[in-house]
């Protein structure tokens, strides 16, 4: 990567409404390379990010899942339960969403996107 520079293309803070209902439908950040979230306020009663398997072939097979509490190749999606201070970074092409927030506890996080461009 010595011939590239990393640039933040976007960064913003989001807080889901105190009355609940905040969410993001499944999407990707097609024009970036790395995306991430830094969680400022969250709990077991707030929204969670869900990451979906981007492989098209995954939709065609339905492997049995032996233990839903462990990550395995059979899973189509992975739910992450962050704690305050959690930093998640992932490939921007990875489909992800935020489940509908209940509004019980405060939920605030920072989004950011990074792009590598030739120097």
Identify the role of each PLM range.
Residues 5, 28-32, 104-106:
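A generic structural micro-feature
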Residues 9, 45-47, 106:
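Residue-level signal for beta-strand positions within conserved beta-sheet cores that form or flank
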Residues 11-13, 36-38, 110-114:
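A structural signal for short, well-ordered beta-strand segments
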Residues 13, 49-51, 98, 110:
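Generic structural hydrophobic/aromatic packing signal, biased to beta-strands
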Residues 70-119:
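Catalytic core of Fe(II)/2-oxoglutarate
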């Amino acid at each position: 990567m010595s011939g590239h520079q990393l640039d933040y293309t976007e960064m913003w803070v989001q807080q889901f409404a105190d009355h609940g209902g905040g969410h993001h439908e499944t999407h990707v950040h097609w024009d970036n390379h790395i995306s991430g979230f830094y969680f400022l306020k969250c709990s077991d009663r707030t929204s969670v990010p869900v990451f979906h398997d981007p492989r098209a072939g995954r939709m065609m097979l339905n492997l049995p899942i032996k233990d839903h509490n462990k990550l395995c190749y059979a899973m189509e999606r992975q739910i992450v339960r962050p704690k305050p201070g959690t930093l998640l970074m992932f490939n921007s092409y990875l489909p992800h969403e935020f489940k509908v927030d209940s509004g019980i506890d405060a939920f605030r996080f920072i989004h950011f996107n990074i792009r590598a461009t030739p120097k």
